[in-house]
């Protein structure tokens, strides 16, 4: 009985790793569509969110089987509960990525001046966030508390990037009012990215 339970736990870990990879891809697709104003990629990112939703259901179903068909002890119950919370948070991060893509489509009529916006900061925020998601899953699967602590600290890095981004946008708006709408749009996108980082921190 216990051997079967351990095999199912291994399957759960593999499915969590798969979902983490999907979230990483969703974030990359969303930010790429945003900074390049790629409407087609934005549409694909929105459609991809449905696949993430299906993966969440797969993991949730596996957790329910572990709870109902096996006889988990207290530490196993904590593990399964943590997995359920993790997939909920990851699914919401996927939703945020889709939100950014929807915003990209709404902004598609505007022509953006790269000089008006620090794209590098936006991409850095996305890179940090995806790295946090992958580390969170790795920390959970490998029960690595030290790695989990680095993720918590990494959220501060994203917060600092977002603060820098806001300050630069305010400066750009003051210098050139016509870029104000562009700046506001990108601020909305980077704000969503910051919330993704905060939710990534909650995974650990």
What residue ranges belong to the model's regions?
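Cytosolic, long alpha-helical scaffolding segments
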Residues: 1-204
């Amino acid at each position: 009985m216990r051997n079967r339970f351990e095999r199912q736990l291994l399957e759960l870990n593999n499915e969590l790793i798969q979902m983490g990879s999907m979230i990483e891809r969703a974030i990359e697709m969303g930010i790429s569509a945003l900074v390049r104003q790629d409407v087609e990629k934005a549409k694909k990112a929105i459609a991809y969110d449905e696949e993430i939703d299906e993966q969440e259901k797969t993991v949730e179903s596996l957790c329910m089987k572990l709870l109902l068909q096996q006889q988990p002890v207290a530490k196993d119950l904590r593990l399964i509960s943590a997995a359920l919370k993790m997939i909920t948070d990851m699914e919401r991060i996927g939703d945020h990525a889709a939100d950014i893509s929807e915003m990209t489509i709404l902004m598609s009529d505007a022509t953006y001046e790269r000089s008006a916006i620090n794209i590098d900061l936006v991409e850095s925020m996305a890179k940090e966030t995806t790295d946090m998601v992958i580390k969170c899953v790795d920390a959970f699967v490998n029960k690595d508390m030290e790695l989990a602590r680095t993720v918590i600290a990494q959220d501060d890095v994203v917060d600092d990037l977002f603060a820098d981004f806001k300050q630069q946008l305010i400066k750009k708006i003051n210098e050139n009012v016509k870029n104000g709408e562009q700046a506001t749009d990108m601020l909305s996108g980077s704000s969503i990215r910051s919330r993704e980082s905060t939710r990534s921190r909650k995974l650990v």
